[in-house]
A protein has these predicted regions:
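Small-residue-biased structural context
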Residues: 1-255
Length: 255
């Protein structure tokens, strides 16, 4: 299969690819999948065909949209899958982690304000505030675990691989253990934000929405979209490749 023209291959073969595989080939597919609420991160292991069937979507219509998006020059497409893992780690921290740290206190303040002012007539805002407070608390701990435990270890095994030095086993045994925990937490965060999207009816504003209300829903939508990209980079690229690197460096010294 030609990686450069993934959306121009036979439709039958294309539909068997998972959502994650498609986005890995060309990250611009993420924007199309977002519009159709196709989860390419936490549940990205579903085939394109199965995902469309589950949601009652017209697969051919989406493929056509993907083909049109691929007509744009590929020159500036970001090839995350080709990056060194330590560089990808820094990218995730500097872009997605920093975005979460900056935006989540602001959104939380708006969530509380909108729930207080509009909760009587729009009780869903009270529930959204409760859910987002859980997201806030969980992600704060999640980012800390990645930045203080998992990511430094990934940088360590990359350094060992490049220097061909003898690796030392981490206290957590295998990288698969913290990765399994991170993936579980990704799923939990994704589920919470999905429930928020349902409660907001896909971020649809009521007629009496004030400026803060409008800003708040835009922030929630942007936050969910960023989380999808963030989780995709980790679950579909960083983690699988890190597992392979760890297996390789220990195998070389055990053989």
């Amino acid at each position: 299969m030609n990686d450069e023209n993934i959306f121009l291959t036979e439709q039958e073969a294309f539909q068997q690819l998972t959502l994650s595989q498609i986005v890995t080939k060309d990250h611009r597919a993420a924007g199309v999948f977002e519009r159709y609420n196709l989860d390419f991160c936490c549940k990205g292991n579903k085939s394109f065909n199965d995902a469309c069937k589950e949601k009652g979507l017209n697969a051919e219509e989406i493929i056509s949209e993907l083909q049109n998006s691929n007509l744009i020059s590929n020159e500036n497409a970001i090839r995350f899958n080709e990056w060194e893992l330590d560089f990808l780690v820094n990218y995730i921290i500097n872009n997605h982690h920093q975005y979460v740290k900056n935006s989540i206190p602001v959104i939380s303040a708006h969530a509380e304000k909108v729930a207080q002012v509009h909760g009587k007539h729009h009780p869903e805002t009270i529930e959204i505030n409760k859910i987002f407070s859980i997201v806030y608390k969980d992600l704060k701990q999640h980012l800390m675990k990645e930045e203080e435990i998992l990511f430094p270890y990934i940088k360590y095994i990359v350094k060992v691989k490049n220097n061909r030095s003898k690796p030392e086993r981490p206290y957590f045994g295998s990288i698969k253990n913290p990765i399994n925990m991170m993936e579980s937490e990704h799923t939990s965060a994704g589920d919470n934000l999905f429930n928020i999207r349902k409660l907001t009816n896909n971020y649809s504003l009521p007629a009496d929405a004030c400026t803060t209300y409008s800003t708040y829903y835009k922030e929630l939508k942007e936050f969910e979209e960023d989380l999808h990209k963030h989780v995709y980079l980790e679950n579909s690229i960083l983690f699988p490749k890190a597992i392979k690197v760890e297996e390789k460096i220990f195998q070389e010294f055990e053989d």
